[in-house]
Amino acid sequence: MLLELARWLQQLESLFGLFNYLTFRGILAALTALFLSLWMGPAVIRKLAQFKGGQPIRQDGPQTHFSKAGTPTMGGSLILLTVTLSVLLWGDLRNRYVWLVLAVMICFGAIGWYDDWIKIVKRDPNGLKSRWKYLLQSIFGLAAGLFLYYTADVPAAITFYIPMFKSIALPLAGVSFVVIAYFWIVGFSNAVNLTDGLDGLAIMPTVLVACALGVFAYASGNVVFAEYLKIPLIPGAGELIIICSAIAGAGLGFLWFNTYPAMVFMGDIGALSLGAVLGTIAVIVRQEMVLVIMGGVFVIETLSVMIQVASFKLTGKRVFRMAPIHHHFELKGWPEPRVIVRFWIISVVLVLIGLATLKVR
């Protein structure tokens, strides 16, 4: 929105040419989302607190979690609102990728909102039935994959790349591309949701991964950097740095209220939407495998649940004291802040490894 105004004003004053720089607008997007979150946060939390009941607490979970009963949830609505406003202000609204990612965020956020609404207002701790949740996720995930396939304007946009082996490029047919897009979008949507079980545990890795994906998006949209780093050149992908920056800013603003002990929880509205956005951006910039590395905390949390369920069904025994795995460490006696910070440290290391693949040929 403001970019179009700046382009018109540039004819009168060259200073407005700054808005043509992605990095400049990315910084503004992050700061806008951050300050909006800090400003609107208290009012949003007060409004959410009016829904008596708060986040349902697992009865078989750690005893320390019972003190969290009544804490407002659906705080992810603050993230979605501030990200959307920031992107609309600073993004290039003629870019199809911007609209696609916003659509994915809103659609998956709507699923999460309805799930949270059932849990809180209707007092149903199970929320939206799993089959309906996965059906809606599948519809939106497949729709995003189909859109990306049929709007691809360069072969690189539908080619599968393996980090550190940049000479290997696997062209994807329609079905294979859409299937991969579906699994990454829906998979990471649910992975972030599973990780969101402790105060601030999910949002900080999300911020870190979003920042790193912003670097990949910027490089993928730049002819010089893409050629130098031997990564796929995706015209228009650079604009995604605005969304990544907005997520980083909004995420830090939300963490101000979500840090231990949390004043508000993200809820499914935030976790499902942010995970889907990370998956979508990774698919657009053709860095699916790098996302698996950088989002390793989300992957580990998901695998722990899958292993736990499979082991119990096959042998009747549990591998972990409780899944997802962050609860396992809690039940081993780790204080919640220790679990959170150590998972953050792991996330920092994994993101750095992911960024290192930019230079490894």
UniProtKB/Swiss-Prot annotation:
Q: Which cofactor does it need?
A: Mg(2+)
List, alphabetically, the PANTHER family matched. Answer: PHOSPHO-N-ACETYLMURAMOYL-PENTAPEPTIDE-TRANSFERASE (PTHR22926), PHOSPHO-N-ACETYLMURAMOYL-PENTAPEPTIDE-TRANSFERASE HOMOLOG (PTHR22926:SF5)
Keyword Magnesium part of the UniProt annotation: yes
Where primarily located? membrane
Identify the pathway.
Cell wall biogenesis; peptidoglycan biosynthesis
The protein's role, per its UniProt record: Catalyzes the initial step of the lipid cycle reactions in the biosynthesis of the cell wall peptidoglycan: transfers peptidoglycan precursor phospho-MurNAc-pentapeptide from UDP-MurNAc-pentapeptide onto the lipid carrier undecaprenyl phosphate, yielding undecaprenyl-pyrophosphoryl-MurNAc-pentapeptide, known as lipid I.
Q: Which UniProt keywords apply?
A: Cell cycle, Cell division, Cell inner membrane, Cell membrane, Cell shape, Cell wall biogenesis/degradation, Magnesium, Membrane, Metal-binding, Peptidoglycan synthesis, Transferase, Transmembrane, Transmembrane helix
* Any one GO molecular function term: phospho-N-acetylmuramoyl-pentapeptide-transferase activity
- Its name, as the record gives it, is Phospho-N-acetylmuramoyl-pentapeptide-transferase
How is this protein situated with respect to the membrane?
A: Multi-pass membrane protein
Query: What's the EC number here?
Result: 2.7.8.13
Chemical reaction(s) catalysed: UDP-N-acetyl-alpha-D-muramoyl-L-alanyl-gamma-D-glutamyl-meso-2,6-diaminopimeloyl-D-alanyl-D-alanine + di-trans,octa-cis-undecaprenyl phosphate = di-trans,octa-cis-undecaprenyl diphospho-N-acetyl-alpha-D-muramoyl-L-alanyl-D-glutamyl-meso-2,6-diaminopimeloyl-D-alanyl-D-alanine + UMP
Please give the biological process terms from Gene Ontology that the record holds: cell division; cell wall organization; peptidoglycan biosynthetic process; regulation of cell shape
TM stretches of this protein = 25-45, 73-93, 98-118, 139-159, 168-188, 200-220, 237-257, 264-284, 289-309, 339-359
What cellular component GO annotations does this protein have? plasma membrane
Pfam family of the protein (one): Glycos_transf_4
| Family, similarity comment | Belongs to the glycosyltransferase 4 family. MraY subfamily.
Q: Where in the cell is it found?
A: Cell inner membrane
